[in-house]
């Protein structure tokens, strides 16, 4: 699938293409990885890969997001075997061992994790500029912040890397990036 067509479709439309057999889940995953390669060097939204063997789960073709690529916020995502470094040099190398309810539900919905998004250290800032990974830039204005703490997720979706990404909010972590 070409990147422009891919970036113009939302998660439900991509899942519908998979259900109709017009594109395979593997093709969508490969397209998402190409989108990361094409865009991420400019905005720094994605800070780590999720290998295909870890990100892809066998789900029913009837799952609402069957085959749709998405990105995990690098903060308490609950995917076993996947690094979760929490935007911090202190978290470098930490690997989740247990699966969270969130992780299980994402997998059951058919989402395919292809990477991890940038977040401020421990999610404690309204701007995604961790020392560990560097700043995430707003894809609409490269001179501006992407906000935070879900700035990597917001920038990745806005730039067309994936149609859907894990984000969380306790004090504006989704609302701040969406308002910028």
Regions found by a protein language model. Give the residues of each.
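Gly/Ser-rich catalytic/binding loops embedded in alpha/beta enzyme cores
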Residues: 2-170
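Glycine/threonine-rich beta-strand-loop-alpha-helix active-site module
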Residues: 168-180
């Amino acid at each position: 699938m070409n990147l422009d067509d891919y970036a113009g479709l939302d998660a439900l439309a991509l899942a519908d293409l998979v259900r109709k057999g017009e594109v395979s889940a593997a093709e969508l995953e490969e397209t998402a990885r190409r989108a990361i390669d094409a865009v991420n060097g400019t905005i720094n939204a994605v800070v780590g890969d999720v290998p295909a063997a870890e990100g892809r789960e066998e789900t029913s073709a009837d799952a609402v997001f069957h085959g749709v690529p998405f990105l995990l916020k690098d903060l308490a995502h609950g995917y076993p075997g996947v690094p979760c470094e929490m935007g911090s040099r202190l978290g470098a190398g930490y690997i989740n061992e247990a699966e969270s309810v969130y992780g299980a539900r994402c997998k059951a919905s058919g989402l395919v994790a292809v990477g991890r998004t940038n977040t401020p250290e421990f999610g404690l800032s309204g701007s995604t500029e961790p020392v560990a990974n560097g700043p995430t830039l707003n894809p609409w204005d490269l001179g501006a912040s992407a906000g935070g703490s879900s700035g990597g997720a917001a920038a990745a979706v806005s730039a067309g890397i994936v149609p859907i990404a894990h984000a969380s909010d306790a004090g504006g972590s989704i609302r701040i990036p969406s308002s910028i």
